[in-house]
Amino acid sequence: VALLKTRARLLRDIRDFFHQRGVMEIETPLLSMAGNTDPEIQSTRTRDGRYLRTSPEFALKRLLATGSGDVYELGRVFRESEAGRSHNPEFTMLEWYRTGYSYYQLMDEVAALVRHIGRDKFSAWQVEKLTYRELFERYLGLDPCTADRAALASAAKRHDVGDIALSRRQWLDLLMSLVIQPALPGQQLTFVYDYPAEQAALARVRPDTPPVAERFELYLGRTELANGYQELTDATEQRQRFDAENELRSQRGLDVYRIEEHLVDTLEHGLPECAGVALGVDRLLMALSGAEDINEVIAFPASRA
């Protein structure tokens, strides 16, 4: 019962935060005709060929293009094959979009939300922002934007975290999750931004040397909590990314998903400049309550659903 009350208070605080800032709550469909083409995410498909959403992102962007203004959604999402201490195949996600915002401004709002919700716990925690490149240079002594697969594999070997054949992106993800993340400060909000271009997902790529994705992640202590973008607004580039992800899925022997044509059409007609972010509500509740396992903060986890 205490857990149910804590969760209810958390959801109320989230809604109060956005009400005070004039951001409108939206409900979008749980089922879609398109899947998530990201090869690191597996969508659940129904017998009639629809997919349970892995995020409300596509639908929220379609509303933004109609002139909805700033919006958020607080609801359930689904990702197959996700299980573990901080994963459940069905979980609660908070996602919101701010028109006219930069991703730097959105980082500040994410920090404000976390401190608002965890005012008794996180208000004294410092906030640090550093680029993905600065992070890797600090903890591994290498430049992730220029290091090749051999250099990344060598760094992994030095830390005893892998002796397998991986792509450059997979090596970066492995080093991030198994070497850097466990070494982050335990009581700090750490924002990591400007990712390598190959990790852009749906973020805009800035033509630096080398190019970087205008993307950020928030680590609450050592827990990955949120993932945000300066949103891509180019329809042609978005279609190319969907196609490239499906090609990679095919190469890995994964299901190839129907792409989100509605989103491509939306971008062709014009998506306003905006920044958006998704935040794991169950993980935030874990941090607030001191829980060590996501099963402790979900009334009906997969094992008991």
Predicted regions and their residues:
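Short aromatic/hydrophobic-glycine micro-motifs
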Residues: 23, 140-142, 161
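Short alpha-helical functional segments enriched in proximate histidine and acidic residues
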Residues: 17-21, 117, 182
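A translation/RNA-centric and nucleic-acid-associated enzymatic feature enriched
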Residues: 29-35, 39-63, 72-99, 144-305
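TRNA-binding/sensing appendages of the translation machinery
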Residues: 1-42, 279
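Hydrophobic face of alpha-helices
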Residues: 7, 11, 15, 19, ...
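Acidic, low-complexity central loop/insert segments
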Residues: 102-128, 132
